Amino acid sequence: MKDLNRLKIVLVEQKKTSKWLAEQLGKNTATVSNWCTNKLQPDLQTLDRIAGLFGVDVKDLLNSTRE
């Protein structure tokens, strides 16, 4: 299955860590790690919060599902 989110890439581009993101969102670091490895996906509200923290559009956090 194709990775749905680009969270790990955006964290690197923004020079932030998954621990930082977990603290900002009040989430467990394991949860954020699962998002970064695409084992789990954040809900739309959380994606919107993440986009706001990074100053990007939600679509910048997602990979296209088109082939």
Regions of interest found by a model, annotated:
Residues 38, 49, 67:
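Alpha-helical DNA-recognition elements
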Residues 1-17:
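A short, Lys/Arg-rich alpha-helix, primarily the initiator
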Residues 18, 29, 44-47:
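Helix-turn-helix DNA-binding elements, focusing on the entry/boundary residues of the two helices
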Residues 21-22:
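Short alpha-helical "recognition helix" segments of helix-turn-helix
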Residues 27-42:
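Recognition helix of helix-turn-helix/homeodomain-like DNA-binding domains
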